[in-house]
């Protein structure tokens, strides 16, 4: 193992770097540094040699050239096991650099600002940093490359335990992380530049929503026993910077390892329950809600959601948007479930659920956030779209019927509309008093989804008198309205936009139904 005797430290993210440098110095490591990093370390009283003094060549061109020098890169790239390299380095007065600690200019943060000019973006493209990172990573057998401040404590511990040396395996892991770091950095630059309006070479160019070259990087969280089916291999990857409050932030408190289907269903349940301001419970089966309700507390919300479809809830995923207490867990564990999700659980609740060792229990921070893009693979390519995060307010709704909805109906219509967004198309949702009363999902014809929702309500013994209906897309014919009217439902919310809208509107008036248009469609496939 190579003993670390000289380190070059030059970082944009200075979190923890002072303590790291102090520990290296205490181990007798000679520190080289540049710019703001050197200033920080010197002001802290650490012995530091500026790279310009080490190379005998000043920083120049507004800092664009700092470390691009043979004495730096020769010291990083030289192989200690090749006599020719050792002799050449000695001939030219090039000393070994055994550790490189570098992270890069904050390019992504810079271009995230909509007012960022092309000039600002270009000036935040790091040149010397990635060059040193790649050089050190290439020569990982002899040089340690540190790009992540989270690694500082463990590296210091290993250096102290091994007389200032890092194991070969450690250096290799650091090199893999380094190349991942530079790949993501270059990908971000490519994404930005290829998103600029064609022909614009200055100022603040207009950006297109989707770059001509889409670079994305994900980190593997876990391998899975299998995928959607046992004959399929699978793994779960997260974004480098996952959306706030997303499934990628889950903390598993107990239970078996999450499966591919568990994560897909848990994501559907969690994204749905997060959209409600009131205390809510969502039960999901095969990525479709089979019961949703709001209530004064989690127990009430669960009982109402479960009552929608007790059969489909078997083996489902249950999500809450409030902390879960012991009484709720007592009720929930009375059914067979795969996953239970909430922002938190009381200690009493955890003790009760612990008896159900196979139940997977997840805590996820209740925060707002959405993926920048949604990706769907197709043969030979990928479909990319922005996420469906559109909600409608009262002021956006348009009543097109003679009958106006009552205040309670309007409240239920907005509730049903939120639920419908998370049901696979064609989606029909019946609701009453903040509870789903019947859900028809995934049918090829809208009227069939309507009939299924009606049958589900009948099977559950739920009265549809005074209930409302939501449709994720327009009614292409009046038949869906007629079936809804047969159930005694007197208010419907839907996007509108069919070529037969007038026929549909007339059917609503014929049945005395209040018909509300959103102007927004929520297809989900």
UniProtKB/Swiss-Prot annotation:
Domain notes: The IMP cyclohydrolase activity resides in the N-terminal region.
GO biological process per UniProt: 'de novo' IMP biosynthetic process
Coiled coil: none
Entry GO terms, CC: cytosol
Record's protein name: Bifunctional purine biosynthesis protein PurH
Annotated metabolic or biological route of this protein: Purine metabolism; IMP biosynthesis via de novo pathway; 5-formamido-1-(5-phospho-D-ribosyl)imidazole-4-carboxamide from 5-amino-1-(5-phospho-D-ribosyl)imidazole-4-carboxamide (10-formyl THF route): step 1/1; Purine metabolism; IMP biosynthesis via de novo pathway; IMP from 5-formamido-1-(5-phospho-D-ribosyl)imidazole-4-carboxamide: step 1/1
Entry-linked InterPro entries: AICAR_Tfase_dup_dom_sf, Cytidine_deaminase-like, MGS-like_dom, MGS-like_dom_sf, PurH-like
Signal sequence annotation: none
Reactions it catalyzes: (6R)-10-formyltetrahydrofolate + 5-amino-1-(5-phospho-beta-D-ribosyl)imidazole-4-carboxamide = 5-formamido-1-(5-phospho-D-ribosyl)imidazole-4-carboxamide + (6S)-5,6,7,8-tetrahydrofolate; IMP + H2O = 5-formamido-1-(5-phospho-D-ribosyl)imidazole-4-carboxamide
Membership in a protein family: Belongs to the PurH family.
Keywords of this entry: Hydrolase, Multifunctional enzyme, Purine biosynthesis, Transferase
Keyword presence, Hydrolase: yes
Listed EC numbers: 2.1.2.3, 3.5.4.10
Disulfide bonds: none
UniProt KW Hydrolase keyword: yes
One term of GO molecular function: phosphoribosylaminoimidazolecarboxamide formyltransferase activity
Domain annotation MGS-like: ranges: 1-147
Pfam families: AICARFT_IMPCHas (PF01808), MGS (PF02142)
């Amino acid at each position: 193992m190579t003993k670390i005797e000289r380190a070059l430290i030059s970082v944009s993210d200075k979190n923890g770097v002072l303590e790291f440098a102090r520990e290296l110095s205490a181990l007798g490591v000679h520190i080289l540094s540049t710019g703001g990093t050197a200033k920080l370390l010197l002001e802290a009283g650490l012995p530091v040699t500026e790279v310009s003094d080490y190379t005998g060549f000043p920083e120049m061109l507004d800092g664009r050239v700092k470390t691009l020098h043979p004495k730096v890169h020769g010291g990083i790239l030289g192989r200690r096991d090749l006599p020719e390299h050792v002799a050449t380095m000695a001939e030219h007065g090039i000393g070994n650099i055994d550790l490189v600690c570098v992270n890069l200019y904050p390019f992504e943060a810079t271009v995230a600002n909509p007012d960022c000019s092309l000039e600002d973006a270009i000036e935040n493209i790091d040149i010397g940093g990635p060059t040193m990172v790649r050089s050190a990573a290439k020569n990982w057998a002899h040089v340690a490359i540190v790009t992540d401040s989270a690694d500082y404590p463990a590296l210091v511990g290993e250096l102290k335990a091994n007389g200032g040396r890092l194991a070969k395996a450690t250096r290799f892991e650091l090199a893999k992380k380094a190349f991942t770091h530079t790949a993501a950095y270059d990908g971000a630059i490519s994404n930005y530049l290829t998103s600029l309006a064609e022909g614009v070479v200055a100022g603040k160019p207009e950006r297109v929503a989707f770059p001509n070259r889409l670079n994305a990087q994900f980190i593997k969280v876990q391998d899975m026993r299998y995928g959607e089916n046992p004959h399929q291999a699978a793994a779960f990857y997260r974004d480098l910077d996952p959306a706030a409050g997303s499934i990628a932030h889950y903390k598993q408190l107990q239970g078996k390892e999450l499966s591919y289907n568990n994560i897909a269903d848990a994501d559907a349940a969690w994204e749905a329950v997060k959209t409600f301001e009131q205390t809510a419970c969502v039960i999901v089966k095969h990525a479709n809600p089979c019961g949703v309700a709001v209530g004064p507390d989690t127990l009430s919300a669960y009982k109402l959601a479960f009552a929608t479809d007790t059969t489909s809830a078997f083996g489902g995923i249950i999500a809450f948007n409030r902390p879960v207490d012991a009484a709720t867990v007592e009720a929930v564990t009375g059914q067979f479930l795969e996953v239970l999700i909430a922002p938190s659980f009381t200690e009493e609740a955890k003790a009760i659920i612990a008896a159900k060792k196979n139940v997977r229990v997840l805590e996820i921070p209740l925060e707002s956030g959405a993926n920048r893009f949604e990706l769907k693979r197709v043969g030979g390519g990928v479909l990319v779209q922005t996420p469906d995060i559109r909600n409608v307010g009262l002021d956006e709704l348009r009543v097109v019927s003679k009958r106006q909805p009552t205040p309670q109906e309007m409240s239920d219509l907005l509730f049903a509309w939120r639920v419908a967004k998370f049901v696979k198309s064609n989606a029909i949702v019946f609701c009453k008093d903040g509870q789903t009363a019947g859900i028809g999902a995934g049918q090829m014809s809208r009227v069939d989804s309507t009939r299924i929702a009606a049958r589900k309500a009948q099977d559950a013994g739920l009265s549809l008198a005074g209930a409302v209906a939501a449709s994720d897309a327009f009614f292409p014919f009046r038949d869906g309205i007629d079936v809804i009217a047969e159930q005694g439902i007197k208010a419907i919310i839907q996007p509108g936009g069919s070529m037969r809208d007038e026929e549909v509107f007339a059917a609503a008036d014929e049945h005395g139904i209040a018909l509300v248009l959103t102007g927004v469609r929520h297809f989900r496939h």
